[in-house]
Amino acid sequence: MTNIRKQHPLAKMINHSFIDLPAPSNISSWWNFGSLLGLCLMIQIITGLFLAMHYTSDTSTAFSSVTHICRDVNYGWTIRYLHANGASMFFICLFMHIGRGLYYGSFTFLETWNIGVILLFTVMATAFMGYVLPWGQMSFWGATVITNLLSAIPYMGTGLVEWIWGGFSVDKATLTRFFAFHFILPFIIAALAMIHLLFLHETGSNNPSGISSDSDKIPFHPYYTIKDLLGAILLLLCLFSLVLFSPDLLGDPDNYTPANPLNTPPHIKPEWYFLFAYAILRSIPNKLGGVLALVFSILILTLIPFLHTAKQRSMMFRPLSQCLYWMLVADLLTLTWIGGQPVENPFITIGQTASIIYFLIILILMPLTNLLENKLLKW
């Protein structure tokens, strides 16, 4: 009797992607984050679906509907905090996944990398719109400040902002459309993730050494399914620890105050995972310049494959590049810290310095270090 796993059209597709997939034998735990992102997306879609059953996207009832979910719905508080902290876990995995791609040279798979950058933008847009939905103070003012940035676009900016708002300020129309987009985007993310995987399976996975692993492959199942399962258990352990012991650790206390257009919070700031980009935005005094720097801070990822001048793909055997890489990580952590601080000295100066260092490392120092390491190879 023929094996249904290898014969049935649908089972065959799953088999080729997750069971009999030839995988390099030496990939480390840094390769776990792809599957963890899939798990995070599933958690977000399921918890989001249950939240949408009780949420009302109306300015007069949105805040109280979230309160109702937490107080009156059976295990509503768990679902709400799983969704909120699940987003934080999503971004932790996302940053680790991108960091691994940069360190081990996975960006040379151009299609996979570029779809990944599109995915990052989509996830960021989804998270931003989700933050607006509880209709607390930080939700309202965050939405006002961030959407207002589009008014910096010459000629069409003001009209574009009013078009997004659906009026002359962030109001009922804005909340309703943000809810609609926030609901549909995760499914678009899931579709993009499938395309991401499709392109990855065209080339096969990279590995820590950065050299071809065609001569030494092992089946994905059981080796990497077990490994991914361990990662999933650890992720769920962290997520549930956060949800059950300290659910508001990563949130903003201002969001427990209903949105009030007449009262501006002293420090408007987004969620922690946007703070690095927010710090870059704030470090430029000019509005249009700030917006361009903000967009380019993410878009710069698409340039990395073209700035890669090294003979070796991975940083595993390139100590100078490793030093620069960890400087970049430290710089991003500094930017994240600065993004949460008030706009006053010395924070302004630190933010501007860290922003310059960020672009300097990626655009100039990395390619130069790569060329220097190429020279050192000949010694």
Curated annotation (Swiss-Prot):
Heme b b562 binds at H83, H182. PROSITE patterns: CYTB_CTER, CYTB_NTER. It is a multi-pass membrane protein. A ubiquinone binds at H201. It holds the Pfam family Cytochrom_B_C. One of its GO terms (molecular function) is ubiquinol-cytochrome-c reductase activity. It is found in: Mitochondrion inner membrane. Its main location: mitochondrion. The keyword Transmembrane helix applies. The chain crosses the membrane at residues 33-53, 77-98, 113-133, 178-198, 226-246, 288-308, 320-340, 347-367. Binds 2 heme b groups non-covalently. InterPro entries: Cyt_b/b6_C, Cyt_b/b6_C_sf, Cyt_b/b6_N, Cytb/b6-like_sf, Cytochrome_b, Cytochrome_b_C_euk/bac, Cytochrome_b_N_euk/bac, Di-haem_cyt_TM. Keywords: Electron transport, Heme, Iron, Membrane, Metal-binding, Mitochondrion, Mitochondrion inner membrane, Respiratory chain, Transmembrane, Transmembrane helix, Transport, Ubiquinone. Its cofactor is heme b. Heme 1 (or BL or b562) is low-potential and absorbs at about 562 nm, and heme 2 (or BH or b566) is high-potential and absorbs at about 566 nm. Component of the ubiquinol-cytochrome c reductase complex (complex III or cytochrome b-c1 complex) that is part of the mitochondrial respiratory chain. The b-c1 complex mediates electron transfer from ubiquinol to cytochrome c. Contributes to the generation of a proton gradient across the mitochondrial membrane that is then used for ATP synthesis. PANTHER family: CYTOCHROME B (PTHR19271:SF16). Belongs to the cytochrome b family. The cytochrome bc1 complex contains 11 subunits: 3 respiratory subunits (MT-CYB, CYC1 and UQCRFS1), 2 core proteins (UQCRC1 and UQCRC2) and 6 low-molecular weight proteins (UQCRH/QCR6, UQCRB/QCR7, UQCRQ/QCR8, UQCR10/QCR9, UQCR11/QCR10 and a cleavage product of UQCRFS1). This cytochrome bc1 complex then forms a dimer. This is Cytochrome b.
